[in-house]
C-alpha cells in the first residue's frame, strides 16, 4: 500500500510534546545551502540550521534539512555516509538543565534501546560528544520516516478503509509488543505515529512512557488531553494498559473523520464530549474509581444517553465501528485489550498470529530514585553514547 507523494509532507519527527511541525514549502531551494564546517580536527561537523547550531560526527553529511520541531528541540534529516541512508537526528539542547527533562531523555533512550520491533521507532546512534566535560546537548539518531499521522490526516491525501485497517493494525501490533514489555506509552496520538510513503507505521516518542509498576503517576508532564482515557481525567492512580487502547480508539475515529474525536477545551469539557458520545457511565462502570469523591463527581455530571455510532460516523465501515465501540468503553476493565483487538474481524485480513511478536524481557527503568542528579543522568547518557561509539573518532 502506498500514499501518493508520501502523504502530506511535514514531519512530526519524534518531537517530544507538540509533535514536530512539518516545514511547508518555501525552503526547498535553500536546503542545499546549509554547509557544514568541520570541527575537532575534522571528526565533527557543525551546521547552522536557521540559527540552530547542530554539531554531529562527520559521518553525517549533507544534504541536511530540518524536518520537525519538538518541544525539546529541532530534528534534521541528514545522510549517514557509511550506510548511505538518510536518518533523523534530534538535538536536545541543554539536556541536563533540569532533572525532569534529563530523566525524560534518559527514559526514551533506555526504552528504545530495550525494544526491537518493526512498529516501534528505533535509535540508530547517540552522538558521542567531542568532549565529556562540555557535554550539554544530546543528539539522538533515529530511522527517518516521511511524515506522521497528524500531518497525513490534515492533508488532502485520500484515505480508504484499507489504509485505516493497515494503520490500526500496525499501531496495535506495535502496542502488543510495548505492553508485553510491561510498558504503557501514555501519549499515543497522531503526531507520535510516524509513517513512510509505503504506509509503514512506527510508534514514536516514548518520553512519557511508564512501566506498569511505576507509581509516580502523571506528576511531571501533562499528556495531550484529547486522547486521554477517562480514568486519567478522573485522576485514577491505578491505571493500566487500557489507557493506550482508549487513545487508539480516539485515533481510529480521527482517521475516519479526519477531525479529533474529543477536542476538549479543558478537562470538564473533555469528559462531557466523551459522555455525549459513549453515554454517561452507570454505577457498575465506576468500580475502577477508588475515590468516593471521584465517583460522586461523575454522578453529578449531566447525564447523556449513548449516541448511535452510525449517526456520528456515517462513512465508517461496520467492522471499524464495532472495534471502535469496544475501545471507547468508560470502564477500563471492560475495554478491549490489544490482543483481543488484533483478533477482531475488522483486522482479520492482516492478523497473523505467528507474526505479532512480544518483547522477550520486561523493561525496568532503574533510574527513578530521586537521588539521581542531572550529573548522574549525564554520565549514564554518556555511557550510552560510548556503546554506539566505543572508539574516539579519529
UniProtKB/Swiss-Prot annotation:
Assigned protein family: Belongs to the protein kinase superfamily. CMGC Ser/Thr protein kinase family. MAP kinase subfamily.
Keyword RNA-binding annotated: no
Domain Protein kinase: from-to ranges: 61-347
Location of the active site: 187 (proton acceptor)
Gene3D superfamilies given in the database record: Phosphorylase Kinase, domain 1 (3.30.200.20), Transferase(Phosphotransferase) domain 1 (1.10.510.10)
Organism encoding this protein: Oryza sativa subsp. japonica
Protein name per its UniProtKB record: Mitogen-activated protein kinase 2
PTMs per UniProt: The phosphorylation on Tyr-221 activates the enzyme. A conserved Thr, which must also be phosphorylated to activate the enzyme in closely related sequences, is replaced by Met-219 in this sequence.
Catalysed transformations (reactions): L-seryl-[protein] + ATP = O-phospho-L-seryl-[protein] + ADP + H(+); L-threonyl-[protein] + ATP = O-phospho-L-threonyl-[protein] + ADP + H(+)
